[in-house]
Amino acid sequence: MWKDFKEFAMKGNIIDLAVAVVIGGAFGKIVTSLVENIIMPLVGVLTGGIDLTASFVYGSGDAQIKLGVFLQSIIDFLIIAFAIFMALRIMTKLTNKKEEAVVEEPTPELDAKEELLKEIRDLLKKEQA
């Protein structure tokens, strides 16, 4: 059983997934910091400093419905999703440019038969002209 588990855990795609989760977590922190410390203060300046987390609170005591916190979370999500979308779009464009630069079509080499056929074609064109 241990051998099977070790085999499963050491497969390439499992390791890739683990690395992706770690990098995704780190990238998530970067995007969250970008949103909280740069984008949201700018949005706050543009909207007159509106902070929805203290707004739209219904009820009292422990039984409170905090609609403002929910709306703020939706706005944060949309901004984070847009930032990730833009980052992925830029990375995709850069990757495509690198692939286009690397891919060069090799010139096809003609073998003896193709060369002979090409000469025959050229001779026929001369006779028709």
From Swiss-Prot:
GO terms for molecular function: mechanosensitive monoatomic ion channel activity. The chain crosses the membrane at residues 14-34, 38-58, 67-87. The keyword Ion transport applies. One of its GO terms (cellular component) is plasma membrane. It is a multi-pass membrane protein. The keyword Cell membrane applies. Keywords: Cell membrane, Ion channel, Ion transport, Membrane, Transmembrane, Transmembrane helix, Transport. It is found in: Cell membrane. InterPro entries: Mechanosensitive_channel_CS, MS_channel, MSC/AndL, MscL_channel. Coiled coil: none annotated. It comes from the Bacteria. It holds the Pfam family MscL. Homopentamer. PANTHER family: LARGE-CONDUCTANCE MECHANOSENSITIVE CHANNEL (PTHR30266:SF2), MECHANOSENSITIVE CHANNEL MSCL (PTHR30266). Belongs to the MscL family. Channel that opens in response to stretch forces in the membrane lipid bilayer. May participate in the regulation of osmotic pressure changes within the cell. NCBIfam families: mscL (TIGR00220). This is Large-conductance mechanosensitive channel. It comes from Lysinibacillus sphaericus (strain C3-41).
